[in-house]
Design a protein with these regions (language model features):
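Amphipathic alpha-helical segments of tetratricopeptide repeats
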Residues: 60, 102, 149-153, 209-210, ...
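TPR/Sel1-like alpha-solenoid repeat signature
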Residues: 69-72, 118-121, 125, 166-169, ...
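Residue-level recognition of tetratricopeptide repeat
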Residues: 65, 114, 162, 215-216, ...
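Short coil/linker segments at helix-helix boundaries
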Residues: 23-37, 42-55, 64, 72-161, ...
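Generic helix N-cap/helix-start motif at coil->alpha-helix transitions
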Residues: 29-35, 181-184, 212-220, 248-257, ...
């Protein structure tokens, strides 16, 4: 959706103990503040409990400063982002964003030119719109974009040379052109906003990725997602994902996106190697390496074995992935795992057909039809249910 969050999560490179933080004078105006870098780095490393304590300490020391409230909400945002299918953290995030907005509003009543209050309110409203967009509440998300734009422009007036604020402008310029094309329902709202400029938005994000102080990593993330999901260019997305994963090797989201993009480019050896590590970390319970990500990893590991005609190995991966799907909930929608459960069963059925186990194959195709469709999964399952799968020889 219209993603106008300004200084998000991607700050800093060195973590520090919670006891090292002090809140006095914490601001995003002016020079680099290592306290911000230290705390936000905990978020990107998915050290959520430690990040909570870090920013709660800031809030306790200076409750009228919106910085602590905003970044505590960012911990909540990453709890959501790491597994978007899990909505159990949504209400907590909305509450944290509301609290941040309220703190900013109190400051703005005293000083309408308060840079931090303007900036953090814009960021909080932007994140609220971002989540609403991810939940397909497109009109409400667009309205948040409408509320956010004046705050974005005002912060730019107050800090015209700040590269990190350029991040918000880049996001706006890109999505203000692209989103109405994809979601016509938001066009009436967009009528009241300035026109977007897709190319300018990309140029601005590139500038932040090169020269940003706090928003550099977030600019890299958006550039990767834009090229993957909106531009359809996995090759252009990959360098950003490699850089992010190398910066934060324990971040499961960057880990999986890098692996998935490598496979999309046909670089199976590298991609499967990364997915094997995803599976190991998932089995070990490492933060961020959840069941849906584990199913995704096993699907690609199994598909690689299927490609190589290592059918027994493929069956092992697919069977484990399917069993994990059942642990996600009682309903087929809950078991879908972003469509990977359907693909797992489709390829498991195809593998069983190659092994001459027709009854097992049919059960798998029936399971595909019971799950939400992913791509052409239902069409293929119906076809293979009628006629056994046979690999086309080249």
């Amino acid at each position: 959706m219209i993603r106008l969050a300004l200084f998000l999560l991607a700050l800093g490179s060195m973590s520090a103990p919670v006891t090292a933080v002090a809140a006095e004078g914490l601001t995003l105006r002016g020079g680099n503040d290592p306290r911000i870098q230290q705390g936000i780095d905990l978020i990107y490393q998915l050290h959520f409990a430690e990040a909570d304590r870090y920013f709660e300490t800031i809030i306790a020391a200076d409750p009228a400063n919106p910085a602590g409230h905003f970044f505590l909400a960012m911990v909540g945002w990453w709890r959501v982002l790491i597994d978007l299918d899990d909505r159990s953290h949504d209400e907590e995030l909305y509450a944290l964003l509301k609290r941040c907005i309220e703190v900013c509003d109190r400051r703005l009543k005293e000083d309408s030119e308060d840079f931090d209050a303007i900036l953090f309110k814009g960021g909080a409203v932007g994140f609220r719109g971002r989540l609403r967009g991810d939940r397909h509440e497109f009109l409400r998300a667009a309205r948040d974009g409408l509320r956010c734009l004046p705050l974005l422009n005002k912060s730019r007036e107050l800090e015209p040379t700040n590269k990190d604020i350029l991040f918000g402008q880049g996001i706006y310029n890109y999505f203000a052109e692209v989103i109405p094309e994809r979601h016509p329902v938001v066009r009436p709202v967009m009528f009241f906003l300035a026109d977007g400029d897709r190319q300018l938005g990309l140029q601005q994000l590139e500038e932040v990725a090169r020269e940003g102080r706090y928003a550099r990593a977030e600019a890299l993330y958006f550039l990767a997602q834009i090229h993957r999901l909106f531009e359809g260019d996995d090759r252009a997305a990959l360098p950003y994902l490699v850089e992010l994963h190398e910066m934060y090797p324990g971040n499961a989201l960057f880990h999986r996106y890098r692996a998935r993009t490598l496979i999309a480019l046909g670089r199976w050896v590298e991609g499967v190697g990364l997915y094997e590590e995803v599976a190991r970390r998932s089995r070990g319970g490492q933060a961020g390496y959840h069941l849906r990500g584990h199913i995704e990893a096993l699907y690609y590991i199994g598909k690689n074995a299927f490609r190589q005609r290592r059918r027994e190995a493929a069956v092992r991966s697919f069977v484990v992935a399917d069993s994990l799907g059942f642990t996600l909930g009682a309903e087929a929608k809950e078991q879908a795992a972003n469509g990977y459960s359907a693909l797992v069963n489709l390829y498991l059925g195809m593998t069983y057909d190659e092994l001459g186990q027709r009854d097992a194959a049919v059960r798998c195709f029936d399971r595909v039809l019971a799950l939400p469709e992913r791509g052409t999964s239902h069409k293929l399952a119906r076809s293979y249910r009628k006629e056994p799968f046979a690999r086309q020889e080249r």
